[in-house]
């Protein structure tokens, strides 16, 4: 697509019109060298065939830009009894080039009629001309054929009447149900359009670049309410007792942000400092669980308005807990929808982790009101500009608004999580081509979200928080109500200097940042766009290899590949053409100051000012790279940890544990060396570091347990219970202490009970018995609920009682804990019953099926059961979840990513190949095959070492 609207050849009138009227919000440049009519006339045989057998006049997946929408007028009438809806719309469009057809998106809609009026027709109230409608479902497009060619630079009004069933899944305009305390099932209608499902609710230009205003009217029964992006203006009484709600016209926005709901929910409301009304909606029986969300939403909205120096532009903000919701939440402008467990908080059954999750998701979605809604990416290849920023802003906002949640200490795990994905060759660049609806859905992954956030955090550390904040404010203000791309962000970050700032390479530092390290940066003359292109336009993560030679540090960078060893024949090919501009940081035994250097070459040398005993790179794990220390580097750091680990920052200790075990997977560090590093953990007081060490040891335990390698399983179990006995024994069974104290408690006790630690089993059994005897009325501390339920689920009586309580519970947090516990049963018939209930979607909602299959597959007794179910029911699963959607990807990865034998690899490969059009092209399949291969290599290389190390350690 062209970079500037100046490239358009318009007459003087159109140039003026675009500049004065459209440019502040939308000025779409043609992506084609000739008009659609010219292309069609030149070679009509190259075009597809519509459903009626006629030639469909458009053959691209992307819509032509000769006609652009300015305003939609929508009238929707859902029937919650017959579960369908009828609707009509008028779209005001601007014709930029003469054409005889208009191409729109439409999916599963029955078009009843379509007509067209010119500006003159509208002015003189002339009836519209009927249009011929052609449909091409393969591209989810319709063509409106006009009798006479539409004239360039004029506006027209397109009127369409249509109808459809409310969707059965979780996309478009769909139905959702909930049960009241009295056992009644009630139905609501709700929308979820991102990324490409607005076309399931109304014919539209369903691409993010086509921003427009929306005026929405909804018809409903009096027992329901209607919600939409904007406040309600008025309600009109219609014949037959129906009501018609009219909503204010929206600001200019993309179709995927349009939202409306018809429901019978109740709400609690508050007001932000700026006067914006904030409301939390939920089903009536769950109203009491909305109060924490209201507190958090008001506080976070106040924060963002201040931080971005831009007022939230709408008069109200509604947050709604939806009973059936596939993802965590959706940032519809002014009407944010959530899965119930992402918004509701029950003080009795919601744990510390639940509270952190709810707060984090609210922070994420509110950040989208600026990043994504106010400024939107041009196309889905840059979805990271929405999602990476929203994830990054979770960190920034929660550090200020909820410091007691200590979110800063958990952000490193955001980066560690995506490194597992990004270190595979099947990864993709942050900014990646996406054309089809399935490819677009697959872009919503850890790379776009987490890696996006991590490189932004690294860039913030590089530029300084002050400079970075100025840059993003500049970016948001410049592109308000418009679309942006990668380069626009780098330009904004490079051009926000104030008087007196030091400048270099287009970016700036305030006087307060003029340290020796900063001056070294300035001498590097870094070009920000060039630097960040190495992080967004190529996949993967760099490995920085450090070797200390006297008072010099020899640095080398290469691509870090998990599961590919340097001696493997493909290693060299996979390294070709990879080079990053890495803003490395380090500290030494001689100086705790943070030293900085930009590694732009394959090899480089850094001179130290004085002799040092050790050096630690990637200070506070703020950089997105792995570090390997050659020579005596690792031995020096292991000695340091054992002698006085507090000489390193807590996040540096966390980073060392992570990097060490990642390097084992790449064959760069021996497993015994990494395990030796964890010996200091008995003295560790930083809980994130302690939990990271436990995480890897538990991972190894589950791996050998699944493979039934009994001697290693027993020895590792013995080691865990022996080595971490002091930590286990000091845990209480109460909800007390800091956030990290409570997360340590739940993690350690959960592992101890999983390992059949007698005191843990005894205490959990005691609490479960008391809970059953109280008919579920006993309040068990929320942080240990999962543990107590999991132990209780091991008996038939306990399992059955938990299933009964699952049906009765009004707390989504409690239902999640019960469902997890039920999936830990050792009885396969019980596990199969659970999965069948999940497929049925009544007792266990379909939205929870993916999680259920994931947790069942983690159970050694359920791993093959879950996998067999997926193979046998793939077609049925695709009827419930869209191809490429997060639930489908979770189901595939959850049931196969733990496989570690060649037979399992072959079985999975054959299944994937058999799917063909039903999914064989999905990126997740390549990820899984590579993951299983990595697991196989890990065991082959490291099992003997693990066995030997354990024998010398217990």
UniProtKB/Swiss-Prot annotation:
UniProt subcellular location: Endoplasmic reticulum membrane
Membrane-spanning segments: 8-28
Bilayer topology term: Single-pass type II membrane protein
Superkingdom of this protein's organism: Eukaryota
Binding positions for substrate per the UniProt entry: 194, 328-332
Residue ranges, Lumenal side: 29-954
Positions of disulphide bridges: 415-454, 753-760
Cytoplasmic side stretches: 1-7
Cofactors: Zn(2+)
Glycosylation positions in this chain: 79, 113, 399, 644
Active site: 365 (proton acceptor)
Post-translational modification: N-glycosylated.
Primary location class: endoplasmic reticulum
Membrane found in the keyword field: yes
Entry's Gene Ontology cellular component terms: cytoplasm; endoplasmic reticulum membrane; extracellular space; membrane
GO molecular function: metalloaminopeptidase activity; peptide binding; zinc ion binding
Oligomer and partners: Heterodimer with ERAP1.
Protein name from the UniProt record: Endoplasmic reticulum aminopeptidase 2
